[in-house]
Structures are given as C-alpha cells and as structure tokens.
Amino acid sequence: DEVETAIKDWMGSHRVPPKLVSLEPMTLDDVMTDIRNLSVALKCEARGEALVKEMSLGFKNLAKAVSGEERKSVFFMEWTAPLMGAGNWMPEIISYGGGDVVLGESGHHSPTVAWDDIHAANPDVIIVGPCGFDVERAREELRSLTDNSSWQSLRAVQDGEVYIANGNHFYNRPGPRLLESAIIV
C-alpha cells in the first residue's frame, strides 16, 4: 500500500496509476500462484494457466522418474559468507530432483549455518549455487572454502560429489526455469 501511494503521488493525479503486483514466493505453490496472478494482471490468463499446468506436470513426471533411485542427502549452499543453506522453494526443487535437503526448509528463508552444522549433516552431495551468481562467480566463492580443513573432511568432498551451479540463471529466481533446475539436480 505504501508503494502504491508513493507511486500515485509521484505520478500525479492526471495519470492512471500502474497496477502493482506484489510477489514474494516462498514455496513452489507460491511461485505457481504468482505466475497466475501475473498472467491476470497482464491479461494473458490462459497462457499463465498453461505454463502452470506444464510446470506441474513436469514436476510430477520428474518425481516419478526418480522415485526408484537412491535418494542422497544434499546441501545446497545458497551463500558462502556467511554460510547459508537452501530455503524458500529450493528444498522442493532438490526433492523433485531426487535428493533430500539438509540444512534448509521449504517455505522459510535460507538459514545461516555453521561448519559444525554441515559436519553433523555430512551430506552425500554439495551444490554451490550462491544467490545471484553465475557459474564463474560461484567457482570463485568455492575457492574460498576449499582450503578449509572442515571442507576437506566432508563426505561429498571426499567422494567428488561437489557441484557448482548457476544460482542466478536457475535456482534463485522464482519462475518457469525452476523445473529445469530440478531436472539438473
């Protein structure tokens, strides 16, 4: 409401104020709802509904495809300083991709974690995909961790199960690419 009032004041009374659509998704269901809400605001409801159906079917098919696979524990590192785990929709993405997220909970902000937390979880897989970073920048962030003795003793590191992800392009933005993100996992 404050933002809408400020925009009306800024534009003056002689112009039609824009329609504001506030988005703050925390789960995949929220992302789907936001797609629907945007499609209504943009007067392309059928297109929005088709996209939601396509994504929902894709997630359902992916879950079916990985259902017989061994599930691995996955630590998705959303940030490196401070260390942060997966929040918002990321635990759902990891689950659809066949993993069980550690140190994160769907529908909640990404938690700050300590090395002791990561050691206690000792994940099978670590995905480094800091929010807003491409692969090259994520690789740079990873270098700051690899000299740490705590890092070297993790099962995922010892087993070569550490992956660098394009958080900016795939994981951190709430939209249609989240299906592709789950497929990548």
Predicted regions and their residues:
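Residue-level preference for short coil/turn positions at secondary-structure junctions
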Residues: 16, 68-70, 121-122, 158
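Acidic/His-rich segments in extracytoplasmic proteins that coordinate ligands and/or metal ions
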Residues: 1-41, 112-153
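Small-molecule-sensing regulatory modules
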Residues: 60-67, 95, 104-105, 113-116, ...
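Structural recognition of the beta-strand scaffold that forms the well-ordered cores
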Residues: 20-22, 73-76, 101-104, 126-129, ...
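Extracytoplasmic metal-acquisition and chelation regions
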Residues: 9-46, 82-96, 155-184
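Basic- and aromatic-lined ligand-binding clefts that recognize polyanionic substrates
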Residues: 47-97, 170
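His/Asp/Glu-enriched short active-site or ligand-binding loop at hydrolase and phosphoryl-transfer sites
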Residues: 87-110, 130
